[in-house]
From Swiss-Prot:
Major surface antigen of procyclic forms. The keyword Lipid metabolism does not apply. It is a lipid-anchor; GPI-anchor. Residues 33-95 are annotated as: Disordered. GO terms for cellular component: plasma membrane; side of membrane. This is Procyclic form-specific polypeptide A-alpha.
Amino acid sequence: MAPRSLYLLAILLFSANLFAGVGFAAAADESASNVIVKGGKGKEREDGPEEPEETGPEETGPEETGPEETGPEETGPEETGPEETEPEPEPGAATLKSVALPFAVAAAALVAAF
């Protein structure tokens, strides 16, 4: 039977990795949203709040349009660009491997302690 200190160490490792995983998830989520709200107040942008531009009265006169020109219709196969691949993650960004690996180690330590 393992001593109590091993049980406590395993629980400590698991909870530390849990909080680290939450931190990784928050860091990954922060890049998606650049504006973090605190206390119900939004963070103002550096360029100031957006205000609609004032425009003068619009002139709505009759528009003269010429005969519509139709271009030659292409019946050949359309050229497609190279297939899009997933972009590489930013350096230091949280990935599934970087978050799941500490949990796996902590879970193995927890199982080994019991």
